[in-house]
Amino acid sequence: MKRIFLTIVVAIFMAEAAKAQMFEPAFQQKPASASPGSRQGGVAMDECIFQFMDGAPAIDVYSIRKGEHLQRIPLEGHKTWHCNNACVSDTYLQKGDKLPLVYVSQENRAEHCICVFRISGKKGAYQAELVQKINLPEPAVMGVWYPNLVLDNDNGDIYVTGYSRESWNDARGGNGLQVLRFKLPAVSYGEFTINASDIQARRNYAFRLATQGAVIKDGKMYQVYGMAGDSSIVCYDLESGVELWAKDLSAAGIPNEPESLFFSGKTLYCVDVKGVVYKCRDL
């Protein structure tokens, strides 16, 4: 009888703990064939998740409601493009385009640029076109290493997050997080270079391991950090720069390395390195 009672108590405790978690699994990304690159940044458009990969070999497309793999959009690929974060803009390249442009940051030691993609067509037959490459200042000049972009569509700004020293996993030497603000360049075919003199604001924060996906909504920036066993999600107020809150992702329901972070409507989603898509219960 005691065992039965204990089992019931444990089951109730686990159920209540699950309810308390910030994120719950929605579905597992399962492409028709093996992924040609590790999952990185992603966005939600047209009731679909567009999942970018390291090396930019392709974009996998999933139904956000059913979890089905709908299509793999081939890209030319670039070994030094990391596709660490992706953001949906509010800009349409051509009149009649169904989907807005997508900005993807190629953060690593070799590349510090942002690629702007136009995705056209319909579900199951999307096509992707590289429209613009935005070059960021050299890290040593900009004062930010491993730069990631985050779009602020409400104010027409680009935020760049990264590190004050050349390491994403070592806090020694005063290494910490840097967040810069630039004005978003106009869209045009070809390349555009942002200069260090274009920096409009700079903010400093305490070190966190491995910058990952980030998104801005309603004046707040949300970013995930870390690896399996040491990860977090942080919310910042854009106007004041204040860190509003931070939560341990393992305790919040995501045990593996977080990668993508994006909104679909009012719902926040996170995709981990293994392709598990998590839905946020409550912000």
Regions found by a protein language model. Name each.
Residues 47-79:
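Beta-propeller domains
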